[in-house]
A protein has these predicted regions:
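Surface-exposed molecular-recognition determinants
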Residues: 11-174
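Sec-dependent, cleavable N-terminal signal peptides
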Residues: 1-2
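Phosphate-/polyanion-interacting regions in eukaryotic proteins
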Residues: 7
Length: 174
């Protein structure tokens, strides 16, 4: 066996670095309601120089529709460094529907012109029945600066009965 090579993990950078929770919050009760202005309902900035080649950034976020007016739609967008890595369908959500998103972003190069590849999914509906999955190549992501991770939500119509609440949000290195 070659020195420094773990046959269980091969070339995985996990051999060199243990996973780390970067951010986690739950129960903030932050809501987006009565507005057609899109809102970053969940947001975290990965610190500058944190990401290394081989890192995997795992993102999980969960929201609940508290109230919905008629046929108004909600569109969730998961973003990494300002780029959409998954855009949910604009759905006529119902009260108590959920929005669940996850993503794995793999760092392939670091520096001022860093590159990454992402696989992400957004599920929306009472049981997460409507699923949108996307693979995205990310370029020009400056890992020497902070990188924002965001869930953006947008209602199609402003109405006092259009309410969505963030329930939990986490970002970790795995």
């Amino acid at each position: 066996m070659a020195k420094g090579k773990n046959p269980l993990y091969g070339q995985n950078s996990f051999d060199k670095r243990v996973g780390e929770r970067l951010f986690a919050e739950a129960g903030t009760l932050l809501e987006h309601e009565n507005s057609t202005d899109a809102l970053d309902i969940a947001s975290y900035s990965i610190p500058a120089d944190k990401l290394q080649v081989g890192d995997i950034v795992r993102i999980k976020v969960f929201c609940t529709v508290l109230d919905n007016n008629g046929t108004d739609t909600l569109t969730p967008i998961l973003k990494f460094g300002g780029t959409a890595i998954a855009t949910g369908a604009a759905l006529d959500v119902a009260d108590s529907d959920i929005v669940y998103a996850w993503a794995d972003v793999h760092v392939t190069t670091e520096g001022s012109a860093g590159t990454m590849t992402a696989i992400a999914e957004i599920r929306t509906d009472a049981v997460g029945g409507t699923s949108v999955t996307a693979a995205t190549n990310l370029t020009s992501k400056d890992t020497t600066s902070a990188i924002d991770v965001v869930l953006n939500v947008d209602w199609s119509s402003a109405h006092a009965d259009n309410e969505v609440r963030i329930d939990a949000f986490s970002v970790e290195l795995v």
